[in-house]
């Protein structure tokens, strides 16, 4: 596996960017560029990543294809297609998004809504995922959906079903097990759940997010995401299972408030390896 962070360190040049990441022990990264970046700037970052042996882990396409607002949905699908094409161009491991929230304009794009589980929603997720992939037909990268606690896919079994029903070689798995820790049983049975995720999804995993969770002791159930190695999850076990995948599989830390927090959290994770 290749550890990395989603945060770009403060830098003035691509070489400085890559050098700082390497000095932290990173071997995976997120490029601080997108499809609108000038060609010469993009090439500079790509060269710096190659020289530092940094694998580009992902090109995020974070948007809401499931929006009930047609304009928002169309814009999201278009963004996903552009980002997937960019991921294909630069050879990123994957292009992740969420399936999306079934909500009108102005609603929380990644939020919990009953309609996320409506019978017709699953079919829409399959159809839009195909539409995104078929516009690009990637061969070097994959479109992926991030696991979520309150939308499709909310379990490894549902992700297996999606892989079958989308039925595209350009569709694969981005694994973020922390997002599936949505009950005390899952929290306390984390090691067994991790094993089940890797048993069902391991061959299709193209990238991983690494996060921690703490179960707080007040009513009602409150599971809070927290920096790695400060919660109750056995991240060493997660990393051991990740190390059994393709050795170039990226494992990224995310959702931390600033660069220094990433530095400190990554140091704790490296100590587990």
Task: Give the predicted meaning of each segment.
Residues 1-93, 119, 130, 172-175, ...:
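N-terminal pre-domain/capping segments
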Residues 7-15, 31-44, 64-74, 103-105, ...:
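Acidic-and-aromatic substrate-binding clefts and catalytic sites of carbohydrate-active enzymes
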Residues 14, 42, 76-80, 122-125, ...:
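Aromatic/hydrophobic pocket-lining residues that form the small-molecule binding cavity
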Residues 19, 51, 70-173:
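Active-site acidic/histidine proton-transfer and metal-coordination neighborhood
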Residues 31, 57-59, 93-101, 141-146, ...:
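Short beta-strand segments at enzyme active-site cores
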Residues 39-51, 80-91, 156-164, 192-206, ...:
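Short amphipathic alpha-helices and their capping/turn segments at secondary-structure boundaries
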Residues 59, 127-227, 232:
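Acidic/histidine-rich catalytic cores of soluble enzymes
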Residues 111-119, 152-165, 223-241, 261-273:
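Short, electropositive alpha-helical surface patch
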């Amino acid at each position: 596996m290749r550890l990395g962070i989603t945060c770009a360190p403060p830098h003035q040049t691509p070489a400085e960017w890559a050098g700082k990441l390497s000095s932290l022990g990173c071997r995976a990264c997120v490029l601080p560029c997108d499809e609108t970046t000038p060609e010469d700037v993009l090439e500079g970052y790509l060269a710096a990543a190659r020289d530092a042996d940094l694998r580009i882990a992902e090109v995020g396409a974070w948007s809401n294809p499931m929006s009930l607002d047609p304009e928002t949905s169309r814009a999201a699908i278009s963004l996903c297609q552009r980002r997937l094409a960019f991921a294909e161009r630069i050879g990123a491991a994957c292009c992740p998004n969420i399936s999306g929230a079934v909500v009108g304009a102005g609603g929380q794009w990644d939020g919990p809504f009953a309609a996320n589980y409506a019978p017709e929603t699953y079919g829409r997720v399959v159809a839009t995922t195909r539409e995104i992939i078929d516009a690009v037909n990637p061969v070097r990268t994959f479109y992926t959906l991030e696991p979520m606690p309150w939308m499709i896919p909310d379990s490894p079994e549902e992700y297996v079903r999606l892989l079958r029903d989308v039925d595209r070689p350009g569709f694969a798995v981005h694994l973020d097990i922390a997002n599936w820790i949505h009950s005390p049983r899952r929290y306390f049975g984390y090691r067994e759940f991790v094993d089940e995720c890797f048993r069902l999804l391991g061959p299709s995993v193209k990238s991983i997010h690494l996060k921690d969770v703490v179960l707080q002791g007040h009513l009602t159930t409150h599971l809070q995401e927290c920096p790695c190695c400060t919660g109750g999850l056995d991240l060493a076990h997660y990393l051991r299972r990740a190390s059994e995948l393709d050795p170039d599989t990226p494992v990224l830390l995310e959702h931390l408030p600033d660069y220094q927090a990433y530095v400190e959290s990554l140091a704790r994770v490296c100590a587990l390896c």
